Amino acid sequence: MSGWGMPRPVFIVSDHTGLTAENIARALLTHFPGQPLRYLRRPFTSDAQAAQAVVSEVEALAASGERPLIFTTTTQPDVLEALQTAPAQVFDLLTENLRLLEGEFAEPPQLGAGGHHDMQDSEAYLSRMEALDFALATDDGIGDKQYGLSDVILVGVSRAGKTPTSLFLALQHGIRASNYPLAEDDFEREGLPAPLEQYRSKLFGLTIDPRRLHAIRTQRKPGSKYASIEQCEYEVRRASALFARLGLPVKDTTSASVEEIAAGVLALLRQSGRLEG
């Protein structure tokens, strides 16, 4: 934990979209689950002036008692030189590895030869931003007219983890994930809610332990019927019965991370042929 009880700032600095830098940073930092972190993305930092702007941000945070981390994949010497002056721990993710590869191949790296990869990176970035827009436009049961464009529709009771999973799938994998909250009215019918009827093949159920659900809802609406243990038990029981009756794939989110939930969704998409790789 950094100064003032705030999560430690993690700067993702790249001369392009920053997707590679962020993925590596997250892969490393996931091994320190007890560390609260907040990610600050600074893509397209391609010259010394832009790098100095990042350094100024870091200096301001350091002055308030924080010690940021900087992860960068830039190959621009002037950008790296500027970042190294920041009062932060800087992780240069490419330079040393490029030096080792230069020794293996007995030839210098062509630092300006990444055009094809840059284009692919930019396309991936745009795809993820489009998926994020779609997830927000079809969050929590809204935008059901667009369900035909969804890669997957997450279904479950309120506060079972649908929205975080939808956003994670969009941002990390470019998946168009919608989500639909099951409400009391939906449990009065034997079949699917009307907006979902023609999209059964896209549905993925999320369930949760009623006691955990009760704790989550109590934080939001203490003392309400919505948060009562009786209501939570009722909704989870009816939702589970619906999933079983329809034969839907289901993931228990009680103690699962967003990454673990998303992995289950991705496995389903691969099995159904809707996702390659």
UniProtKB/Swiss-Prot annotation:
EC class name: transferase
Protein's UniProt name: Putative phosphoenolpyruvate synthase regulatory protein
Chain residues that bind ADP: 156-163
Protein role: Bifunctional serine/threonine kinase and phosphorylase involved in the regulation of the phosphoenolpyruvate synthase (PEPS) by catalyzing its phosphorylation/dephosphorylation.
Catalytic activity from the UniProt record: [pyruvate, water dikinase] + ADP = [pyruvate, water dikinase]-phosphate + AMP + H(+); [pyruvate, water dikinase]-phosphate + phosphate + H(+) = [pyruvate, water dikinase] + diphosphate
Family under the similarity heading: Belongs to the pyruvate, phosphate/water dikinase regulatory protein family. PSRP subfamily.
Cited InterPro entries: Kinase-pyrophosphorylase, PSRP
Upper taxonomic lineage: Bacteria, Thermotogati, Deinococcota, Deinococci, Deinococcales
Keyword field: Kinase, Nucleotide-binding, Serine/threonine-protein kinase, Transferase
One family name in Pfam for this protein: Kinase-PPPase
EC numbers on record: 2.7.11.33, 2.7.4.28
A GO molecular-function annotation: protein serine/threonine kinase activity
Keyword Cell division: no
